[in-house]
């Protein structure tokens, strides 16, 4: 899988950064793209990338602030003409997301040529699709804001060839049945496939956060995540300033990384007060501390393998 950022600024765009938008490429598990938040100008950002709107099957909105949703109506309209015709879309988000989209379409007399399934979250959500499990949990941002825990399908354990040979089953097409089915038959006897496979391995876990100040659900969402995408609107200065506005400070994120045993953290939603030079200088200062966990300040069009 791969995470790509189409917008990394907080609140307002800058000359260097667009407002929030993240793409999650599900390959090799699926040929689909999932978007998380669609800030103003997202569809224009996507034009500079190989991702096609027709491959976007799901959009997850973290919360209803404008820097996370103002690009949604335009992107949905353009999807009709960029490979999305008759391809269903699932839109997940807080209560009000359906009304927002439908009102925008109605008032602009825009017409989509594909169906949308709306899923509005009430406190929390567990959603299953193509072997993936997505959990949404409420954060603390003053308005309903959610974090998403995306769990890829389990990888089936390796076939124990010697054990199969011991029952007289030599390598061949039957091995695929052992790998992909719960049971298989050989010489008139039914066997449990799990007895001839190694332990299954949980697929990668990606945690993607909406805006929030520290809260207990953060640890639920990010526990043992392979990759965490988290906001740090404030990356210097006093922490209470961030928390007073229901946002996170870089110190909050570092604490969460350690508490939740996160392997890699990608920090986005940086205040427009910081330019690229500021961010690079702060990064160099932070990594001088041996206690600083593994993280990156991301910029628009950055991509990271999961």
UniProtKB/Swiss-Prot annotation:
The keyword Oxidoreductase does not apply. Zn(2+) 2 binds at residues 67-68, 211, 269. GO terms for molecular function: 3'-tRNA processing endoribonuclease activity; zinc ion binding. The active site is at residue 67. Its cofactor is Zn(2+). It comes from Staphylococcus aureus (strain JH9). Homodimer. This is Ribonuclease Z. It catalyses: Endonucleolytic cleavage of RNA, removing extra 3' nucleotides from tRNA precursor, generating 3' termini of tRNAs. A 3'-hydroxy group is left at the tRNA terminus and a 5'-phosphoryl group is left at the trailer molecule. Binds 2 Zn(2+) ions. Its EC number is 3.1.26.11. Belongs to the RNase Z family. InterPro entries: RibonucZ/Hydroxyglut_hydro, RNase_Z/BN, tRNase_Z_dom. Keywords: Endonuclease, Hydrolase, Metal-binding, Nuclease, tRNA processing, Zinc. Zn(2+) 1 binds at residues 63, 65, 141, 211. Zinc phosphodiesterase, which displays some tRNA 3'-processing endonuclease activity. Probably involved in tRNA maturation, by removing a 3'-trailer from precursor tRNA. NCBIfam families: PRK00055.1-3 (NF000801), RNase_Z (TIGR02651). Disulfide bonds: none annotated. Pfam families: Lactamase_B_4. Coiled coil: none annotated.
């Amino acid at each position: 899988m791969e995470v790509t950022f189409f917008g990394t600024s907080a609140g307002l765009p800058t000359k260097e950064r667009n407002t929030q938008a993240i793409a999650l490429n599900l390959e090799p598990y699926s040929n689909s793209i999932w978007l998380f938040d669609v800030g103003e100008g997202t569809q224009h950002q996507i034009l500079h990338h190989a991702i096609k709107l027709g491959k976007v099957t799901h959009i997850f909105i973290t919360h209803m602030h404008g820097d996370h949703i103002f690009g949604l109506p335009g992107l949905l309209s353009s999807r009709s003409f960029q490979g999305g015709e008759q391809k269903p879309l699932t839109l997940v988000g807080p209560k009000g997301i359906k009304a927002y989209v439908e009102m925008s379409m109605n008032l602009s007399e825009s017409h989509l040529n594909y169906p949308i399934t709306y899923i509005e979250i009430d406190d929390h959500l567990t959603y299953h699709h193509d072997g993936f499990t997505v959990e949404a949990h409420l954060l603390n941002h003053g308005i309903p804001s959610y974090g998403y825990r995306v769990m890829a399908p389990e990888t089936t354990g390796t076939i124990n060839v010697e054990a199969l040979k011991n029952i007289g089953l030599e390598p061949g097409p039957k091995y695929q049945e052992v790998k992909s089915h719960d049971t298989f038959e050989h010489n008139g006897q039914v066997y449990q496939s799990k007895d001839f496979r190694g332990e299954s391995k949980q697929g990668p876990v990606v945690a993607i956060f909406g805006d929030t100040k520290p809260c207990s659900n953060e640890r639920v969402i990010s526990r043992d995540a392979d990759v965490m995408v988290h906001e740090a609107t404030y990356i210097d200065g006093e922490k209470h300033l961030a928390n007073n506005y229901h946002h996170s400070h870089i110190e909050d994120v570092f604490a969460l990384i350690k508490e939740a045993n996160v392997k890699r953290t990608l920090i986005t939603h940086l205040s427009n007060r910081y330019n690229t030079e500021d961010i690079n200088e702060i990064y160099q200062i932070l990594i001088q501390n041996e206690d600083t966990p593994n993280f990156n300040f991301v910029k628009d069009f950055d991509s990271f393998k999961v």
